[in-house]
Amino acid sequence: MGVQKTVVEAPSTVSAEKMYQGFLLDMDTVFPKVLPQLIKSVEILEGDGGVGTVKLVHLGEATEYTTMKQKVDVIDKAGLAYTYTTIGGDILVDVLESVVNEFVVVPTDGGCIVKNTTIYNTKGDAVLPEDKIKEATEKSALAFKAVEAYLLANLQFLA
């Protein structure tokens, strides 16, 4: 299995706790509300939403894919960390075995920084083309900005 990795840091004026809650813990409801063109709905297949939960994400019309199956690996509320692995669905194409997304939300004066490490585990000696990695990174950045705008407009609803 080959491994390709990206690391992205995104600053925000949203507090670390509210970003962690809205962007990561509540992603199953926030993303379809804010970005229905990317994520239509999320269905829990196994588990209760905690570590070990397996979800089926139904993708929207803005993507060429229809589904991705994710498994929640880490929920560390004290450390503001969240990790999930995409383990199935047509989004993995023929090249990928899995994709691990590790998030850590770091508090800053006046907001936070969301650090996202994405690890692409390819099948055999396969290599994911750089343009596909760049495209995925750009879509993630746009999704982050859309969710951030939603959170800024709706902070009163976050615990």
From Swiss-Prot:
GO terms for cellular component: cytoplasm; nucleus. InterPro entries: Bet_v_I/MLP, Bet_v_I_allergen, Plant_def-hormone_signal, START-like_dom_sf. Transmembrane segments: none annotated. SUPFAM superfamilies: Bet v1-like (SSF55961). CDD domains: Bet_v1-like. The keyword Thylakoid does not apply. Coiled coil: none annotated. It comes from the Eukaryota. Pfam families: Bet_v_1. Keywords: Allergen, Pathogenesis-related protein, Plant defense. GO terms for molecular function: abscisic acid binding; protein phosphatase inhibitor activity; signaling receptor activity. The keyword Chloroplast does not apply. GO terms for biological process: abscisic acid-activated signaling pathway; defense response. Disulfide bonds: none annotated. Belongs to the BetVI family. This is Major allergen Api g 1, isoallergen 2. The lineage of its organism: Eukaryota, Viridiplantae, Streptophyta, Embryophyta, Tracheophyta.
